[in-house]
Amino acid sequence: MGRGAGREYSPAATTAENGGGKKKQKEKELDELKKEVAMDDHKLSLDELGRKYQVDLSKGLTNQRAQDVLARDGPNALTPPPTTPEWVKFCRQLFGGFSILLWIGAILCFLAYGIQAAMEDEPSNDNLYLGVVLAAVVIVTGCFSYYQEAKSSKIMDSFKNMVPQQALVIREGEKMQINAEEVVVGDLVEVKGGDRVPADLRIISSHGCKVDNSSLTGESEPQTRSPEFTHENPLETRNICFFSTNCVEGTARGIVIATGDRTVMGRIATLASGLEVGRTPIAMEIEHFIQLITGVAVFPGVSFFVLSLILGYSWLEAVIFLIGIIVANVPEGLLATVTVCLTLTAKRMARKNCLVKNLEAVETLGSTSTICSDKTGTLTQNRMTVAHMWFDNQIREADTTEDQSGATFDKRSPTWTALSRIAGLCNRAVFKAGQENISVSKRDTAGDASESALLKCIELSCGSVRKMRDRNPKVAEIPFNSTNKYQLSIHEREDSPQSHVLVMKGAPERILDRCPTILVQGKEIPLDKEMQDAFQNAYMELGGLGERVLGFCQLNLPSGKFPRGFKFDTDELNFPTEKLCFVGLMSMIDPPRAAVPDAVGKCRSAGIKVIMVTGDHPITAKAIAKGVGIISEGNETVEDIAARLNIPMSQVNPREAKACVVHGSDLKDMTSEQLDEILKNHTEIVFARTSPQQKLVIVEGCQRQGAIVAVTGDGVNDSPALKKADIGIAMGISGSDVSKQAADMILLDDNFASIVTGVEEGRLVFDNLKKSIAYTLTSNIPEITPFLLFIIANIPLPLGTVTILCIDLGTDMVPAISLAYEAAESDIMKRQPRNSQTDKLVNERLISMAYGQIGMIQALGGFFTYFVILAENGFLPSRLLGIRLDWDDRTMNDLEDSYGQEWTYEQRKVVEFTCHTAFFASIVVVQWADLIICKTRRNSVFQQGMKNKILIFGLLEETALAAFLSYCPGMGVALRMYPLKVTWWFCAFPYSLLIFIYDEVRKLILRRYPGGWVEKETYY
C-alpha cells in the first residue's frame, strides 16, 4: 500500500460533482478495493524503507514530523460504517411492503366516509371505523416489527473494540505510550506478546515474534514474524504485521506503513460497508403478493363500478361501492400474521443457536441454494488435536472425539512410553490455572496450538503432564526457531538418579537426519534403508491426510560425561545434538465437528451445494472436505484422476472430475467466465489459500449462476462476502465484531450443523406463511360476494363492514398465526431449493384455490344460512330480489313480507343485523375445515396428525369469540350483533364437511399422480 496504493488513496476523500458521477466513482472504488493488496514495502531493504518514510530506524520520527503526518493523514482509526437513522428504520416498518396496501385501504375508507357525509344527513359510520382500524393495525404491527429489529441490533453495537487502545512508539529515541489513534505512517512501533498490532507494520527486528492472523487470513496456526522478505504476496510474507491482528508471543519492532482506512483491515471494513445489499427474497415475494392482491381487488371493483352505473345507481353511490369492494379485498389481519410468523421462527431459531438480526433473513435461509462455508472453526473444532502416531513401524489412530470415546491403542509398548515422555517434556504449553474440574479437551492452555494439542493428548493417555515434568526437571532448552526447525530440552531422568535425557522434536526430515538408530519395541536398532522407507511412507500418508507431522527423538546422555549439576551451554552447544535415537511421529489436525458430516449430507439431499472457502493449505482443505463429505466418497479431482491413470494433469478433461480444488493463486488469474465454468461444471468445490477479496468474487460468481448464497465467516476478512451474500452468517464465539456487524445471522455455537437447522426453519416458515395466507385469503370470498349480490340483485346486505372486521381481526387471527407452529411435512428437506422465479409465496394457483374453489363453497354456506333466517322470518328468496331500496328506506314502516305481514324500518334492521351475525357465524364454521385442510399442502391431514396444540386452541378460540360476540348483552348496540338460534349455527356444517372431503380427495390425487393435471392446476 506504501505510497502508490496507500497514501493518495483514501475512500473518504473522494467526491464527485454530480450524483451519477458519485455512483460511478463508488463502483470504481469498490472495484479498486476488490483487487488484491498492492504493496511493495515488504520488498524494500531497510535503508530504502528509512528513506521512503523519512525515518531513522533506531530513533524513530521526530515529534514535529509525526504531527505533520497526523495532520495530513488523519487519526489511525476506521471510519465507522454508515448507519441508518432510527426514524428511517421506523418509517420503513410503517410504510414498507404490505403496510402500503393497508394505508391505501384506510385512505379510501376516509374518502368514502367523506363522500357519504357530504351526501347524507345521517351517514353510517362504518367506513370511518374501518379506516381507523386499518390505520391502527399498521401502526401497531409497525411498532412491533421495529421493536423486534431494534432488540436484535442492540446485540450488534460493537466495532468499537476493533482498535487497540494504546501503542508503544519510539520518537526521537524515546519510548512512549500513546493513544493508538495518534500512530502515524513512518512511526517506529514496538509490539510484544499479548498486544494488538496498532497499524500495518514492516518488521525491522524481531525476537521469537508470532502473530495470530486468523481473523485476516483464516489460518489457525500462529505465524512467525521476522525482518526477511519471504513471499511476493504481502499477505504471505513474514515481514509484515497487520493492523488489529494479535501478537501471541515474542517481541518485534516495525515501521508503520499504513494507518486507519488505508490498512489491509481498513480496506476490508470499507469494502464491507460500501457494498450494495440486495432485497431479501421474502420482501420481493410480499411485493409480488401485493401486486396480485391489488389486481384481484381492483379488477372486480372497477367491473362492478361500471355495472352499478349501468344498473342506474348514481356515480357517488358507485364510487362508494368501488371503495367497498377494494377494501373488502384487503386482508387486514395478514400483515400481523406475517410479522408474528417470522418473529416466532426467529425466536425458535435463537433457541437452536441461530440469532437472526433482521426478520426477513429467516426465510432467505430457507431458499438458500449454495452455502460457502469457512473451514476453521465452522466445519472444524478450531483446536489442533493429535490425530495419528507412528511408532513400532505402525500408524496408530489417536482419539480425536470431543468426548474421548474413540479409538484406543495398546499403551504398554515401551516405545509409546518414550514417545509420550518426549511429547510431554519437550513442550512449553501449560494448562491455565483453576481448570481441574473441566474435561481435558475443553481446558484452556497457554502455548502454541501444536504444543497444546500434544499436551492434551499426553494428559489424556498418560495422566498429569505437570507431575511428569516435576519428576524430570528441565535443566536446559533451545526453543524452536525457523532456521534449525527443531526444539530441544535436557532433563534430569527420574529412572536414573545420576543421568540426563536429551529430548527433541521438530520437522520429521530434520529430526531423522540426526538419527542413525530407531527405537522399536523398546530396543534401539540401526535405521537402515528399509526403516527409512517405512518412515517416508508413514510421513507421506499422514501429510496426505492434511495433517501437521512432527518427529520425535531422544538421547540418554552418559552420566560419566554429563553428571548431575553439569552446566549445559545452549549457545556454544557443549553437548551432542547428532547421533540421536528416532522414536516416532505424531500428527495433528484441526478435526471436523461431530455433527458436520450429517449436516452436509442433509444439505445434499435438500439440493444445496456446499462450497468450502478457506485460507488454509489445499491438502488440509481437501482432507477436511473429504472428512465432512463436501467431497463425497468416490468423487475425484483432476489431480486424483491424473494420479490414478499416471498421466500429466493437462491430459485430463476437467469435466470428468466432479470435485475440484482451486488454489487462490490460480483464482487470481481467472476471468469471471472461467470461474463461472468451474461453478457450473463441478458439484463439489473447495477453494484453498484464498484471500478476503477472492471470497467476495466467489460469492458474486455463485450469484451470477442465479444461486441464493449463504456465506459463513468469522474473520474480518469475511465481512465483504458476508455483506454481499444473500444471507451472511457470522460466528458468535470466534467471530470478530466486524463480521457480526456485516452478517444477517449469527451462529451462537459456531457450528455448521446449526445452519442446516436454520435452512429447515427457513423452508418451514415459507411453507407455513403460504398456509397462513391461503387460510386468510379464503374468507375474502364469503366477505365480498354478499356485497356484490347486494349491488346486482338488490337484496338486503347479507354481511356488514363491522362483521367483516370481526372476522379479519378477530376470529381469523389466532388460527392464522397457529399455522406458524405447524410441524414440517415429511418432504421438507428432500425438496430442491425454491426457485424464486417460479415458486412464489402467493401464486395464481393459491389464489384460484382460495378464491375460486374453497372460498366459493364457503360463500354458499353463508348465503344458505342468510336465506334460511330470512325465510323463517317470512321473506322468501323470491321476495328479496329487488327489495333493497324499500328495505333501506327509513320512511317506509309498512313493508310486506311473502306472507303479507308488515315490517317497520327498525324491525327490518334487527332481522338484517341478525343475518349479518349468522353469516359471520357460518364463516367461522367453514373456516374450521379451511384451517384443518391448510395444515398440509400435499400430505393427508391423517398423515400429519393434530399435534399442533396452538391450532386446536385457535379452533376453540375462534368459536368462543364468535359465540361471545353473538350472545354478549349490549353487542346489539356496540357492534350490531344479535343472538342466534342454536339451529342456525348448523346451517353451514354440511359445507364445512364438503370442504374437508373435497380437499382430502384433491391431495390424494396429488400424491397418486405427481406432476399430473391436478398438481399443475391446484398445488400451491
UniProtKB/Swiss-Prot annotation:
Binding site residues for Mg(2+): D714, D718
Keyword set includes Phosphoprotein: yes
Highest taxon above the source species: Eukaryota
GO cellular component: cell projection; cytoplasm; plasma membrane; sodium:potassium-exchanging ATPase complex
Protein's recorded name: Sodium/potassium-transporting ATPase subunit alpha-2
Region (Interaction with phosphoinositide-3 kinase) residue spans: 80-82
Encoding gene, per UniProt annotation: ATP1A2
Signal sequence range: none
Subunit architecture: The sodium/potassium-transporting ATPase is composed of a catalytic alpha subunit, an auxiliary non-catalytic beta subunit and an additional regulatory subunit. Interacts with regulatory subunit FXYD1.
Broad class of enzyme this protein falls into: translocase
Phosphoserine: modified positions: S10, S439, S450, S496, S559, S587, S672, S826, S940
Polar residues bias: start-end ranges: 212-227
Transmembrane segments: 86-106, 130-150, 287-306, 319-336, 770-789, 800-820, 841-863, 916-935, 949-967, 983-1003
Recorded GO MF terms: ATP binding; ATP hydrolysis activity; metal ion binding; P-type sodium:potassium-exchanging transporter activity
Active site positions, chain numbering: D374 (4-aspartylphosphate intermediate)
Stretches assigned to the Cytoplasmic side: 6-85, 151-286, 337-769, 821-840, 936-948, 1004-1020
Family to which the UniProt record says this protein belongs: Belongs to the cation transport ATPase (P-type) (TC 3.A.3) family. Type IIC subfamily.
Positions of post-translational Phosphothreonine modification: T570
UniProt propeptide residues: 1-5
Primary subcellular site in the record, as a coarse category: membrane
Reactions catalysed, as given in the entry: K(+)(out) + Na(+)(in) + ATP + H2O = K(+)(in) + Na(+)(out) + ADP + phosphate + H(+)
Known EC number: 7.2.2.13
Region (Disordered): 1-31, 212-231
Keyword terms of this UniProt record: ATP-binding, Cell membrane, Ion transport, Magnesium, Membrane, Metal-binding, Nucleotide-binding, Phosphoprotein, Potassium, Potassium transport, Sodium, Sodium transport, Sodium/potassium transport, Translocase, Transmembrane, Transmembrane helix, Transport
Organism: Pongo abelii (Sumatran orangutan)
Localisation: Membrane; Cell membrane
